[in-house]
Amino acid sequence: MKSIQIRTSEVARVAAKNIVINGSDTITAVAKSAELQALKASLMRGQIKTWLYKKVNGKIRQCTGTLFNSLVKSMTVGGHTPKKVFGQFAYIEIFSDGHCEWRSFREENFIGTIEN
């Protein structure tokens, strides 16, 4: 299996947002940002992962999702990922009953991954 490659410019960008918006210390901000980029790379390789993030209303949300290529293509209209807004992390959430929906959250609200 190929190693996961993380773009350092993305890590720095998200870490800076975490420091400014959430008042995080540098080490925590960089660690969360690197973990988010590793999560994205894993999801794009077809893995299904579970993670936590803070919703806009302050509640903590646990979700399970993927960015598996064929699933993304089947759920995309017009060739663009829904909610593709700078600063948002868009993903396909997989529910226990098998149905899937597009979701997104603010990058700076990422808490961490949960081992599956």
Q: What spans do the regions from the language model cover?
A:
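A short, Trp-centered hydrophobic/proline-enriched beta-strand micro-motif
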Residues: 45-53
